[in-house]
Amino acid sequence: MEQLAKSYEPGDLERRWYQHWEQAGYFKPSMDTSKPSFAIQLPPPNVTGTLHMGHAFNQTIMDGLTRFYRMKGHNTLWVPGTDHAGIATQIVVERQLADQGLNRHDMGREAFTSKIWEWKEKSGGTITSQMRRVGCSVDWDREYFTMDDVRAEVVTEVFVRLYEQGLIYRGKRLSNWDAKLGTAISDLEVVSEEEDGHMWHIKYPVVGSDEFVTVATTRPETLLGDVAVAIAPDDERYLHLVGKQLELPLTGRTIPVIADSYVDKEFGTGFVKITPAHDFNDYEVGKRHGTQLINVMSLEAKILAKAQIFGFDGSAQGAIELPAAYAGLTAQEARKAMLADLQAQGLLLETKPHKLMVPRGDRTGTVIEPLLTDQWFVAMNKVAEGDATGQSIAAKAIEAVESGEVRFVPENWVNTYNQWMKNIQDWCISRQLWWGHQIPAWYDEDGNIYVGRTEAEAQAKAGGKTLRREQDVLDTWFSSALVPFSTLGWPEETPDLKAFLTSNVLVTGYEIIFFWVARMIMMTKHFTGKVPFKDVYIHGMVRDHEGKKMSKSEGNVIDPVDLIDGIALEPLVEKRTTGLRRPEKAPQIAKATEKLFPEGIPAYGTDALRFTMASYATLGRSVNFDFKRAEGYRNFCNKLWNATRFVMMNVDGKDCGQDESLPLEYSFVDQWIIGRLQQAEIDVTNALETYRFDIAAQVIYEFIWNEYCDWYVELAKVQIQGGNEAQQRATRRTLVRVLEVALRLNHPLMPFITEELWQTVAPLANAKKTESLMLAPWPVADESKISAAANARMEAFKDMVNAVRNLRGEMGIGPAVKAPLFIETADASIADFVPYLKLLARLTEGTLVAKLPEDDAPVAMSGEARLMLKVEVDKAAETARLRKEQGKVEAELAKLTAKLEKPGYVDKAPAHLVERDKAQLAELNDKLEKIRVQLVKLA
């Protein structure tokens, strides 16, 4: 039999096995319709990207589930893919072109998009090669890209159908406008951070009176678009002003005072300027009161010469001249000029420092302007024409969760989902970009819209009119929302669609419940009548060791592949400090990295990383990544490797009980480990079925490290050396069979090391029924093998081992010294413990006696038994050792007592520290007492 390498080296082993699995086709579904199906959707990572810790976390969980259900015999499919990531990708390529002195407008749309495709082909493989490194057992033959031809057809089909059902429309709406990118962006792409700003108090005179109102604002530059000033309906101070007109400073216009529940009378001055064309809250207020929308800003976020006036239905209602002095100024420039003019006219009453949340584009850092733009929308609360269900898209998705068709794990996320779904707005699906699915709509010269699957189809609807195509592309989330069925052959009724829709579970982070999860439920339910998945397992976010969010700008991002392969300090610093949005932070990031990783990051291997991630997968809570834990699990891999080598050296070429007809005599130790294995099988299965990967990892770790390696393997050494043939055969059989099953149990979490070891162990356990551990059956517990009697005996034995070890410690007997043990007991069966005790407690012999010898030696209790170690002690040397130890303990006691008696310490220090100190004090007193007793005995 091939010998296992002396030491565990993950790198080569991982590459070798992954290549073998992929080439052998093990990742493909069996398509055996007599078996239950298990399907899982990968949240498609951005094609621009590289794997980050969040990916490694959620891919560990997804792969763990896929491997678990594959071993359970299910027809298993995990579809991989990447997302075209509209904005992110376009920005990356634009930056690269800028380095060459080019921009997209000079190149034109066709040349620019072909550049992106070129770049995508080059870099798109990074993420998939990294997924291979993490061990993802996805069916690579079904890999998709959200802009490939198949997906493009589905996107067009869905758009056309929604348009024909009256659910897609074009309108003028307020959107998050990134002037640097020149596009509307989604709420997800807006990051609001607290910044230092000002609150300006401005005087708005009441027309025909010497009264005035004081409006507090953080954005005086939008004053040009004000349509009203609002007060709270219950603000009795100002109710007499409702309906009166105010002079709008700097404009020569007048605007009314209105009452609206949006206003908080306790905040600021109680007066709020209403600018519906430049603020989302004001938009809703304006809509309630039927005001106009006055747009004062261009798409470049500069003040217009003429403000455009619109109705809430999008109709153009003329224009008004704005003060010429502000035309063409940026928001910041206009603010400065207007404040100076307000000051000069005596209308600026006060300027106060004020902290405010400033919305910025997460990719550009540009301040986001709410702007009125022409956009395409999907109606969320309207029933489609001819829809027999009588439900809107949103209503279908709400019902799917309320009825339990879709379940959230943990279920507290249902409230978050419902809250959002029940207040849902129409979905803005257009983006003013060049990279993405171009909207399949055409316009004639009069602006009439023709939607078609192809230009020819649109042309047929338009008669002979000349058409021009819509330039906007669809929001990236539009194509992502279709993934549950666009990857399975829809609109055709394919075997894949039949077998794998509805999929079993979606594994994702909480931050995209609305943007992706809800939209998949809406679209899949609307177009197929089915829900996309039964369960939504929401996991927490992986943060750095201090609990900070990992981000490029913080310089605390960790590449999972660097944990797998290791990385030296210099390239790590370079990686963390290049491409920063704020390059001035580079020295600070370099310093922090050097402090945290003075020698770089060691190689932990994939299995240790995966096990770390699994151990962190508690329900829904964010986790702080600790390298010590990864190190601990790398040691666990070593432990498993070395234990397997020991087992193989002791059983290879010997009788391991493969011949079932030969006699077997199992000891209580064998029965105990076999029973513990059954319990581990039950616990790990339950944990994986309920997405408790943390519990699965804990059970596997404790069983393999503590019970199998630390106890059973040690005790098996005694049984292999002593005992008759039937006993030795039973021990060898137990060693290999328990290990083989433990490797199967651990395979979903640690696929590589378990496969390598299983190939060696399985033949000796009569378990090599399949080519690969991946295809081996999942262990099924036999509860009849759990012996309460064997468990009780083992607990009694462990207690005795610990009691003897404590005695040795108390007597200062070093590990090199063996000593005889006397056991006072009436229970003759304790004699069975002696051979094991000799090995584990370092004894020369163990003797059962009716009464312990009359001696000054310390006595320990273990159950009903009394234990004594008989050691000739050098009294003078032992007394000197104890006196030295006594002095040390007394010094520590004095120091700790002084600390606790220090005035104010107990009252002011954190409670957990005080408790810790008190516990330590009690421990030291106990230790001192034991030393004194020993000294008395020696004297």
UniProtKB/Swiss-Prot annotation:
InterPro entries: aa-tRNA-synth_I_CS (IPR001412), aa-tRNA-synth_Ia (IPR002300), Anticodon_Ia_Val (IPR033705), M/V/L/I-tRNA-synth_anticd-bd (IPR013155), Rossmann-like_a/b/a_fold (IPR014729), tRNA-bd_arm (IPR010978), tRNAsynth_Ia_anticodon-bd (IPR009080), Val-tRNA_synth_C_sf (IPR037118). It comes from the Bacteria. GO terms for biological process: valyl-tRNA aminoacylation. It is found in: Cytoplasm. The keyword Protein biosynthesis applies. GO terms for molecular function: aminoacyl-tRNA deacylase activity; ATP binding; valine-tRNA ligase activity. GO terms for cellular component: cytosol. A motif ('HIGH' region) lies at residues 45-55. ATP binds at residue 552. It holds the Pfam family Anticodon_1. It catalyses: tRNA(Val) + L-valine + ATP = L-valyl-tRNA(Val) + AMP + diphosphate. CDD domains: Anticodon_Ia_Val, ValRS_core. Residues 876-939 form a coiled coil. Catalyzes the attachment of valine to tRNA(Val). As ValRS can inadvertently accommodate and process structurally similar amino acids such as threonine, to avoid such errors, it has a 'posttransfer' editing activity that hydrolyzes mischarged Thr-tRNA(Val) in a tRNA-dependent manner. Belongs to the class-I aminoacyl-tRNA synthetase family. ValS type 1 subfamily. HAMAP family: Val_tRNA_synth_type1. NCBIfam families: PRK05729.1, valS. ValRS has two distinct active sites: one for aminoacylation and one for editing. The misactivated threonine is translocated from the active site to the editing site. Monomer. This is Valine--tRNA ligase. The lineage of its organism: Bacteria, Pseudomonadati, Pseudomonadota, Betaproteobacteria, Neisseriales.
